[in-house]
Amino acid sequence: MRRVILTTGGTGGHIFPALAVAEEIRARYPECSVLFMGGLYGPEADLAARAGLDFVGLPVRGVLGRGVRAIGAAFGMAAGIARAYAVMGRFDPDIVLGFGGYAAFAGVLAARLRGRPAAIHEQNSVPGLTNRVLSRVVPRVFLSLPDTLGAFPPQKTCLAGNPVRASIVACGAERSDPRPDHVRRLLVMGGSLGARAINDAVVSSLPALAEAGVEVWHQTGAADWERIRKAYAETGHGEGRVEAFIDDVASAYAWADLVLCRAGATSVAELAVAGKPAVLVPYPFATHDHQTHNARWLVSRGAAVLLEQKDISMTDVPALLVGLLSDRARLNRMAVSARAQGRPDAAAAVVDGLVELLKTTPRAR
């Protein structure tokens, strides 16, 4: 493998699995050039740069649900496909792998138009539109969850798991040092972009958490950081660590006893690999409610508790969190259940699949 393009964008749920595969490729093939192709308007350019990857941006945005703005988005998609097509000619990839999102639509379609081998990876239990369309033009579809097997042609599918970055795999392989019973640590994450409903629920819970001696590490998202930071200061919660974005999420997982977060596919996969008990609050407006489906995968196995956003106001959130953090035996059982669902080998399985695909797929020149 000499040159590979990974294409996706929009949210960390698409981006981080791509970065995990990039890590695996570079570990196995140090001379291989990996190019990240994403959108111009999301966090992917910054995240790719932090991972040491070259980046090409495409002027693509979502088309569905944008009303009159869909016209401009459609022109942007056409321009994105044209730019991706030109990049394919210059970079000359051996293979292209898409991880969903509109940038992946442009990138994978351009690869197929150029006659380059291509594959896609679906993270969620309910497939997104991009991958449902692209599955018709690629020979291989990598899946994260068995629930998705019936959504694509069976001869194309490979159940590989959702790739997780090596630092998180290492976190899961190491058992946390035993802590005194009075030490209780809550990690709060609303995804790469934050989650206002989760942020507000935690702020309302701060007095009770402080009284119970709970330490909090809180990822707010950039838009909410200043407001939530002030709320912590006003409530006098001296044990709170508030950040817009946590760069070293593996260290955060290793630190935490319990995680309160959304139920994006990548978050769910990371929780499983890291072996972390969780309270999951699915984003209620996700396409096809896929976050609720993702959450139920862990909840049904005893690794997480489901808290629907519509029920937050009617739920005693402080009692729920403190109750879980005070029950060390239950947390341990949840951790074991989570770890049993993890696929720490997912990135390796995807790269194995790409290598096999290269052996069997003719490449146009």
Swiss-Prot record:
Its main location: membrane. It catalyses: di-trans,octa-cis-undecaprenyl diphospho-N-acetyl-alpha-D-muramoyl-L-alanyl-D-glutamyl-meso-2,6-diaminopimeloyl-D-alanyl-D-alanine + UDP-N-acetyl-alpha-D-glucosamine = di-trans,octa-cis-undecaprenyl diphospho-[N-acetyl-alpha-D-glucosaminyl-(1->4)]-N-acetyl-alpha-D-muramoyl-L-alanyl-D-glutamyl-meso-2,6-diaminopimeloyl-D-alanyl-D-alanine + UDP + H(+). It is found in: Cell inner membrane. The keyword Cell inner membrane applies. Its EC number is 2.4.1.227. Pathway: Cell wall biogenesis; peptidoglycan biosynthesis. Signal peptide: none annotated. GO terms for biological process: carbohydrate metabolic process; cell division; cell wall organization; lipid glycosylation; peptidoglycan biosynthetic process; regulation of cell shape. GO terms for molecular function: UDP-N-acetyl-D-glucosamine:N-acetylmuramoyl-L-alanyl-D-glutamyl-meso-2,6-diaminopimelyl-D-alanyl-D-alanine-diphosphoundecaprenol 4-beta-N-acetylglucosaminlytransferase activity; undecaprenyldiphospho-muramoylpentapeptide beta-N-acetylglucosaminyltransferase activity. UDP-N-acetyl-alpha-D-glucosamine binds at T11, G12, G13, N124, R165, S192, I246, Q291. GO terms for cellular component: plasma membrane. It is a peripheral membrane protein. It comes from the Bacteria. HAMAP family: MurG. NCBIfam families: murG. Belongs to the glycosyltransferase 28 family. MurG subfamily. Cell wall formation. Catalyzes the transfer of a GlcNAc subunit on undecaprenyl-pyrophosphoryl-MurNAc-pentapeptide (lipid intermediate I) to form undecaprenyl-pyrophosphoryl-MurNAc-(pentapeptide)GlcNAc (lipid intermediate II). This is UDP-N-acetylglucosamine--N-acetylmuramyl-(pentapeptide) pyrophosphoryl-undecaprenol N-acetylglucosamine transferase. The lineage of its organism: Bacteria, Pseudomonadati, Thermodesulfobacteriota, Desulfovibrionia, Desulfovibrionales. The gene is murG.
